[in-house]
């Protein structure tokens, strides 16, 4: 039945994006054994398709053999309890997945790349603590050369995660000494923030290329509109807003067990453990309880949208930044039970209010049918068709729809595609830009897509393109890569934002 629904869905013009439950990316590699099992069953059939018919059939084969997000129930527990899933052996599934990827690469007949454009990639990885420039340990027995896509396709038992680098580019114990330029920037921030009335325009200008870690919490509070510019009013404002938030907790949180709120709370309760599942900080019960309260109270106070999957990701950058105000060591491995109750309450309330300010600007992304996202995806398609027609035509040739990969980019603000440290750096700029999370994000997505044009054009079938676009190799990215991405996005905005006819046919 699920297969029939899949075929019917893809053949009609879908207006509703539906569920977004299966999400993969830089932080969530595609390790679903059910998917790989379906692929290997049909591999022999794909090889027998004549070349002239391969283009037309590839999409329908993918649709027939893939369970859509729309066909999967919200309750993961029901899915995992099914007899078919219980009979799967994880080792066999992973081995099968590796074989599928190897066969897929052999299908593509291409000129051999020069050694200068290839990179050594380890076959087996282990989790290590490192800075943002840390290199992964390499198994000496594997000396084969692989292209950048294969970095993510090797499917190790545990994904590659340089732990410290995933959250921040600095930490108290291992950060390199600050340069003279960095010290000068930090001093300028401190002068701005300590003035009686902070010049917010100047603060935005200074924050665009990134905010120093030491002053990021207060800078984010100011840029989001949570704190007033006047220093004398800040303490009272924080006290009042924090008390107001916990007033909401007392008033509404007990209603989570009422019938008309049970579905909302149940979905939040399911989604919280999925939030950055490989970072120890977010697996602590106390942290998950904080996230549940934040998301439930926001959903109750915004009935037009309620809770939508993906909003849970938007809490994490604020939580990490405000936690770093009290923790100088490795944040992601820090045990929050070591903090006082007052500190935890401050972090929770500030995360709630700043997330609320963010969502106020993009709430049409999460109302019924998510019209904001559909509009942005269409705008991205039009923009890419003008700035890189070759990539756009490549998608059309292999029947790849922008909604199939860019929906997640808009819904999660690229958080599933980038390590968390990169998201925090990206949000420094988003909060410095007018309508950064809504308008400027479109140009960041366009620049992000074109960044991978070579890898995109190298893929010559629908499956390969979707695997690439849903699992882009950004795990080693840091401030430098984000800076280049933002510079390109700014160039695109300068060229097209005030001249819409430039990207209209």
Curated annotation (Swiss-Prot):
Residues 129-146 have a biased composition (Polar residues). One of its GO terms (molecular function) is GTPase activator activity. It comes from the Eukaryota. Residues 105-146 are annotated as: Disordered. The keyword Phosphoprotein applies. The lineage of its organism: Eukaryota, Metazoa, Chordata, Craniata, Vertebrata. May act as a GTPase-activating protein for Rab family protein(s). The modification N-acetylalanine is found at residue 2. InterPro entries: Rab-GAP-TBC_dom (IPR000195), Rab-GAP_TBC_sf (IPR035969). SMART domains: TBC (SM00164). The keyword Acetylation applies. GO terms for cellular component: Golgi apparatus. Interacts with ACBD3 and ARFGEF1. Interacts with YWHAB, YWHAE, YWHAG, YWHAH, YWHAQ and YWHAZ. PANTHER family: TBC1 DOMAIN FAMILY MEMBER 22B, TBC1 DOMAIN FAMILY MEMBER GTPASE-ACTIVATING PROTEIN. Keywords: Acetylation, GTPase activation, Phosphoprotein. The modification Phosphoserine is found at residues 58, 116, 154. Residues 210-434 form the Rab-GAP TBC domain. This is TBC1 domain family member 22B. Pfam families: RabGAP-TBC. It comes from Homo sapiens (Human).
């Amino acid at each position: 039945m699920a297969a029939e629904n899949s075929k019917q869905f893809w053949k009609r013009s879908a207006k509703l994006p539906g569920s977004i439950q299966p999400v993969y990316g830089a932080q969530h590699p595609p390790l679903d054994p059910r998917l790989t099992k379906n692929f290997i069953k049909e591999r022999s059939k794909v090889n027998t398709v004549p070349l002239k018919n391969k283009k037309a059939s590839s999409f329908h084969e993918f649709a027939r053999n893939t369970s859509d997000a729309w066909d999967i129930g919200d309750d993961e527990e029901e899915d995992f309890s099914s007899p078919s899933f219980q009979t799967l052996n994880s080792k066999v599934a992973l081995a099968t997945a590796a074989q599928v990827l190897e066969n897929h690469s052999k299908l593509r007949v291409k000129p051999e790349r020069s050694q200068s454009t290839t990179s050594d990639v380890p076959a087996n990885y282990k989790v290590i603590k490192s800075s943002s420039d840390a290199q992964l340990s390499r198994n000496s027995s594997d000396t084969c050369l692989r292209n950048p896509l294969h970095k993510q396709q090797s499917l190790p038992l545990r994904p590659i995660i340089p732990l410290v680098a995933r959250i921040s580019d600095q930490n108290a114990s291992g950060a390199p000494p600050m340069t003279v330029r960095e010290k000068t920037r930090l001093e300028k921030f401190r002068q701005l923030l300590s003035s009686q009335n902070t010049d917010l325009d100047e603060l935005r200008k200074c924050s665009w290329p990134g905010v120093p870690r030491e002053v990021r919490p207060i800078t984010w509070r100011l840029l989001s509109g949570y704190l007033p510019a006047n220093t004398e009013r800040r303490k009272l404002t924080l006290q009042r807003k924090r008390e107001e938030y916990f007033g909401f907790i007392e008033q509404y949180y007990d209603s989570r067990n009422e019938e008309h709120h049970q579905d909302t709370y149940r979905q939040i309760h399911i989604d919280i453990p999925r939030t950055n599942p490989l970072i120890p900080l977010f697996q602590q019960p106390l942290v998950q309880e904080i996230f549940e309260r934040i998301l439930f109270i926001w959903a109750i106070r915004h009935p037009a949208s309620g809770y939508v999957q993906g909003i849970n990701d938007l809490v994490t950058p604020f939580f990490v930044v405000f936690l770093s105000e009290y923790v100088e060591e490795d944040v992601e491995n820090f045990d929050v039970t070591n903090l006082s109750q007052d500190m935890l309450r401050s972090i929770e309330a500030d995360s709630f209010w700043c997330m609320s300010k963010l969502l106020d600007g993009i709430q049409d992304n999460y109302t019924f049918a998510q019209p904001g996202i559909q509009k942005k995806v269409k705008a991205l398609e039009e923009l890419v068709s003008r700035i890189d027609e070759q990539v756009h035509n490549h998608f059309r040739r292999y029947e790849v729809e922008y909604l199939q990969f860019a929906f997640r980019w808009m819904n999660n603000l690229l958080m599933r595609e980038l390590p968390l440290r990169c998201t925090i750096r990206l949000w420094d700029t988003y909060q410095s830009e007018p309508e950064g999370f809504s308008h400027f994000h479109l140009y960041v997505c366009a620049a992000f897509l074109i960044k991978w044009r070579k890898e995109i054009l190298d893929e010559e079938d629908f499956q390969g393109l979707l695997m690439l676009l849903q699992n882009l190799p950004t795990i080693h990215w840091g401030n430098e890569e984000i800076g280049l991405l933002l510079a390109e996005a700014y160039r695109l905005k300068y060229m097209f934002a005030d001249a819409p006819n430039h990207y209209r046919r």
